[in-house]
């Protein structure tokens, strides 16, 4: 009798996503002393939380079926021609950037470039981005992206507060000409900090002595181009700082903010090649004066040298960041928008200064022609000067004009019942302008002559604000203008880096799992990419279905009652979660509850976020096994019971174990009046096995760019939705375009909406069974590595059963004491083996935290373990004197090709340096630089493209 042939394709994707094959899985289980994956799960998960997860999800669809399903959803979105503007514009993504960057796993699967030696490609692209921003804004220091324009404005507000000499002031001025969504996010950020945001027309502003800072929009949201020079001087005279939200494309033609006195410039790089995406993700920017660089939020790429004196790039001044300064950090932002910043960077590289200026001139000329034509039809723009946006007083015709436009599949900006607006962009054509005239013309009116107006129309930019300074003079912006050259430049940069397309990235607490191609495909569909976030609701039915279904999926995975998809990073999810707790306490008259308990092992974002949410941090101790010290927690909860707002706790713990006492911890906090925030960074060990919403959590954020397969993008984008129990649901983030209007934490109602299809696809293809399998295999893979390496490196923390969760921590401190070899030396030596290092010195200094994820095969796990064992042998050779304690393969790692072919004076061989295992002979990654000098980089800070002489030397 023949075997039964399987006729269904359900669940077939599971085996594509999960790395170990059946025979390997069984062998790995046997190594651990188990005969089934269920037995391992039963042993790892604490008894008190077993059975809390009931994944009520259908079976997984095949890749083809899931793509067909999401295509049907996408087709429900209506793609109108949009002239809404308001910070979001249609753009052309150049095809070579789409194909060679956005759709290239060498770019989108990379991690944040904390290991500079294996990140030189994307660091160079980010340095180009910083140079682009610095040039266009006229300010010397720019960061490597923020989350969106509105959150960048909020960062600018707190930046001004820190630096203003008007220390007594708690008032921040925001122009009423700023984008409305920016003002909403400012209000959200200001309230917990005791800051009052005063929104008014700057032209009616009297005394400014009560303000510590100001935000101005340039050009204004309604289209006006104002001269702010005198106003900036007034604010400076009052010891206030001035931030300007500026349109990058307009800055190719207009005087940059830095030249009229602005202290900070912020904005969005979206219109540099990044689709609308229903609101995101898009890269924001932040630039400032050199004197303020150490107070900047976000990551900063700087120029340094490697140990051979060769120019090398790195992340600079990391002591500002939350993973080091914790509650004293300049910001809680961790993941930003690197992938989108790189798209904008390459858009500028491809077009160059001339191309960008041509685009800007064309957009402005078309807007001027449109305005002149409307004037002949009896409609005059309210603005005397403008770049690309107009406001029209249309009176009683307003509603009818919107209806007429929509009948032609066109969206105009809704301002009020008497006025409307429109913004042009690089996709606007002559025929589009003529269609707009036809909409506004009364019956019987002749349409203007486009050609005649094109010959006669004058610029509507103010003569006194025309840009005089040059832009983008560096060679990188003047060389790669043919597709061939750009394609090769992108390939050259990608080849410098290590991403998931080449190797496992075993970073603890980062969950660098497979980003399957089928999950990525919908991201570039026009139905998801070309929808404006403020389009009429009936045009986004597909997105509404997608978000409704995804929220239900995530509720099923977490045990929570409601989900908000708005937070566009894990840091924003943390923030939204604590704001929900704060608002809940306030609604009950408990405004005095402001103490947040945080274990000493917590990630630095936790205390930084608590500080932003207006809470006071009280640190609780951990015991010798890395668990929360429950008695210390109990004592502090009782001590602060009248002020206790919340606890922030990561589960499984930051130490990589399932703490037995998690239910007791939650109970202690609840008994003393607090709420439980369970950080979802480690959710990849729990889906299908236990649910935080069912064992005591009141709110959690999830990292969709970890557990749910959105790629890290080299440092973003991320999505950090929150799940809440029903009593917190009324306090989730709101938005002007949602039922709840208050509490927006980012500019768009659904945050980074255009990458949500990735998570929808992952869950739909895995189904409930597959999601549980993913968690189980993540735990198996981590325990397999732990078991293989424990005789070579002590595993610092395990559960009571001797097992870890989905990651393990290797203690290298004894090695440092016995040999002088540091955790940094081991991390750099792994590069010679072709591996990205695990997480270094977090959560414990002198350790490596390893998280392999479920996507890695046994072969890859063994390759990594073999590398670590070989490195231990080299360390042993240092310990016994066989290798010199200072001149050895670890201290000199990583080794470059240039070093190998040059003069060789080391006491170990070239072969040992670069081919420590035979498998590298067939497949070798060559780092482009040697070990980077961090101290040199911070002491000699350069954060823009170096001069042509340095460029040639490099």
Curated annotation (Swiss-Prot):
GO biological processes: glycine decarboxylation via glycine cleavage system
Pfam families: GcvP2_C, GDC-P
CDD domains: GDC-P
Gene Ontology MF annotations: glycine binding; glycine dehydrogenase (decarboxylating) activity; pyridoxal phosphate binding
Cofactor(s) annotated in UniProt: pyridoxal 5'-phosphate
Swiss-Prot/TrEMBL keywords: Oxidoreductase, Pyridoxal phosphate
Domain of life: Bacteria
InterPro entries in UniProt: GcvP, GDC-P_C, GDC-P_N, GDC_P, PyrdxlP-dep_Trfase, PyrdxlP-dep_Trfase_major, PyrdxlP-dep_Trfase_small
Modified residues (N6-(pyridoxal phosphate)lysine): 706
Documented EC number(s): 1.4.4.2
GO CC annotation: cytosol; glycine cleavage complex
EC class (word): oxidoreductase
Catalysed conversion reaction: N(6)-[(R)-lipoyl]-L-lysyl-[glycine-cleavage complex H protein] + glycine + H(+) = N(6)-[(R)-S(8)-aminomethyldihydrolipoyl]-L-lysyl-[glycine-cleavage complex H protein] + CO2
Quaternary state and interactors: The glycine cleavage system is composed of four proteins: P, T, L and H.
Function per UniProt: The glycine cleavage system catalyzes the degradation of glycine. The P protein binds the alpha-amino group of glycine through its pyridoxal phosphate cofactor; CO(2) is released and the remaining methylamine moiety is then transferred to the lipoamide cofactor of the H protein.
Family from the record: Belongs to the GcvP family.
Protein name: Glycine dehydrogenase (decarboxylating)
């Amino acid at each position: 009798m023949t075997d039964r042939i399987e006729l269904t394709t359900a669940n077939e994707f599971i085996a594509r996503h999960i790395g170990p094959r059946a025979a390997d899985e069984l062998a790995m289980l046997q190594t651990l002393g188990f005969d089934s994956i269920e037995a391992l799960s039963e042993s790892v998960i604490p008894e008190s939380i077993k059975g809390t997860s009931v994944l009520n999800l259908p079976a997984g669809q095949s890749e083809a079926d899931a793509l067909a399903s999401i295509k049907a959803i996408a087709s429900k979105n209506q793609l109108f021609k949009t002239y809404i503007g308001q910070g979001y514009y249609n753009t052309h993504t150049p095809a070579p950037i789409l194909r060679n960057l956005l759709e290239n796993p060498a770019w989108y699967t990379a991690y944040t470039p904390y290991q500079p030696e294996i990140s030189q490609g994307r660091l160079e692209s980010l340095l180009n981005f910083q140079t682009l921003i610095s040039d266009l804004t006229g300010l010397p220091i720019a960061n490597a992206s923020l989350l969106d324009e509105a959150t960048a404005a909020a960062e600018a507000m707190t930046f001004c507060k820190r630096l203003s000499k008007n220390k007594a002031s708690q008032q921040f001025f925001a122009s009423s000409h700023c984008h409305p969504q920016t003002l909403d996010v400012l209000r959200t950020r200001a309230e917990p900090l005791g800051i009052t945001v005063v929104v008014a027309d700057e032209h009616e502003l009297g005394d400014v002595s009560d303000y510590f800072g100001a935000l101005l929009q340039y050009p204004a949201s309604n289209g006006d181009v104002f001269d702010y020079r005198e106003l900036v001087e007034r604010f400076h005279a009052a010891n206030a700082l001035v931030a300007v939200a500026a349109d990058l494309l307009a800055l190719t033609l207009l005087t940059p903010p830095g030249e009229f006195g602005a202290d900070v410039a912020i904005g969005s790089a979206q219109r540099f090649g990044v689709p609308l995406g229903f609101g995101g993700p898009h890269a924001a920017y932040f630039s400032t004066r050199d004197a303020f660089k150490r107070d900047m939020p976000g990551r900063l790429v700087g120029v340094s040298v490697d140990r051979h004196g060769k120019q090398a790039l790195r992340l600079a001044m990391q002591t500002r960041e939350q993973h080091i300064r914790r509650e004293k950090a300049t910001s809680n932002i961790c993941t930003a928008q690197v992938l989108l910043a790189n798209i904008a960077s390459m858009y500028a590289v491809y077009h160059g200064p001339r191309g960008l200026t041509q685009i800007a001139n064309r957009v402005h000329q078309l807007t001027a022609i449109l305005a002149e034509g409307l004037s002949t039809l009896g409609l005059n723009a309210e603005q005397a000067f403008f770049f690309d946006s107009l406001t029209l007083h249309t009176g009683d015709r307003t509603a009818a004009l919107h209806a007429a436009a929509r009948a032609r599949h066109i969206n105009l900006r809704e301002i009020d019942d008497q006025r409307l607006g429109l913004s042009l962009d690089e996709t606007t054509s002559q025929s589009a302008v003529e269609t707009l005239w036809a909409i506004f013309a009364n019956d019987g009116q002749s349409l203007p002559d486009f050609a005649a107006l094109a010959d006669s129309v004058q610029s509507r930019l103010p003569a006194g604000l025309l840009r005089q300074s040059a832009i983008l003079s560096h060679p990188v912006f003047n060389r790669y203008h043919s597709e061939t050259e750009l394609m090769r430049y992108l390939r050259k940069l990608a080849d410098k880096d290590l991403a998931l397309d080449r190797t496992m990235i075993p970073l603890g607490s980062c969950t660098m799992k497979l980003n399957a191609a089928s999950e990525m495909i919908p991201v570039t569909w026009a139905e998801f990419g070309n929808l404006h976030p403020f389009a009429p609701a009936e045009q986004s039915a597909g997105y509404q279905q997608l978000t409704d279904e995804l929220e239900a999926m995530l509720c099923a995975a977490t045990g929570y009652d409601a989900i908000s998809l708005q937070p566009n990073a894990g840091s924003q999810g943390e923030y939204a979660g604590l704001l929900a707790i704060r608002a809940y306490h306030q609604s009950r008259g408990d405004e005095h509850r402001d103490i947040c308990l945080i274990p000493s092992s917590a990630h630095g974002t936790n205390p930084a976020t608590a500080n932003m949410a207006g809470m006071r941090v009280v640190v609780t101790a951990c015991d010798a096994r890395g668990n929360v010290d429950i008695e210390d927690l109990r004592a502090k909860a009782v001590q602060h019971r009248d002020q206790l707002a919340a606890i922030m706790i990561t589960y499984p713990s930051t130490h990589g174990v399932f703490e037995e006492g998690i239910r007791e911890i939650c109970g202690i906090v609840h008994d003393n009046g607090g709420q439980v925030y369970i950080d979802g960074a480690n959710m990849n060990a729990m889906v299908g096995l236990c649910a935080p919403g069912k064992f005591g959590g009141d709110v959690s954020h999830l990292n969709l760019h970890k557990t749910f397969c959105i790629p890290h993008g080299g440092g973003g984008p991320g999505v950090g939705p929150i799940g809440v129990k029903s009593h917190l649901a009324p306090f989730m983030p709101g938005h002007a375009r949602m039922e709840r209007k208050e509490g927006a934490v980012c500019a768009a109602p659904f945050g980074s909406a255009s990458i949500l299809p990735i998570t929808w696809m992952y869950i739909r293809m895995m189904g409930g069974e597959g999601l549980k399998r993913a968690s189980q295999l993540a735990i198996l893979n981590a325990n397999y590595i732990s078991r293989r390496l424990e005789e070579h490196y002590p595993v610092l923390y395990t559960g009571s059963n001797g097992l870890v969760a989905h990651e393990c921590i290797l203690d290298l401190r004894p090695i440092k004491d016995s040999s002088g070899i540091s955790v940094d030396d081991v991390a750099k030596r792994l590069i010679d083996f072709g591996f990205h290092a695990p997480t270094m010195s977090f959560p414990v200094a002198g350790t490596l935290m390893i998280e392999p994820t479920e996507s890695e095969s046994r072969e890859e796990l063994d390759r990594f373990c073999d590398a670590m064992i070989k490195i231990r042998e080299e360390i042993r050779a240092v310990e016994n004197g066989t290798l010199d304690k200072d001149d050895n393969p670890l201290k000199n790692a990583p080794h470059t090709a240039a070093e190998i072919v040059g003069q060789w004076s080391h006491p170990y061989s070239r072969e040992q340096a670069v081919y420590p295992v035979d498998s590298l002979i067939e497949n070798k990654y060559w780092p482009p630089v040697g070990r980077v000098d961090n101290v040199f980089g911070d002491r000699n800070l350069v954060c823009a493209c170096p001069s042509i002489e340095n460029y040639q030397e490099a």
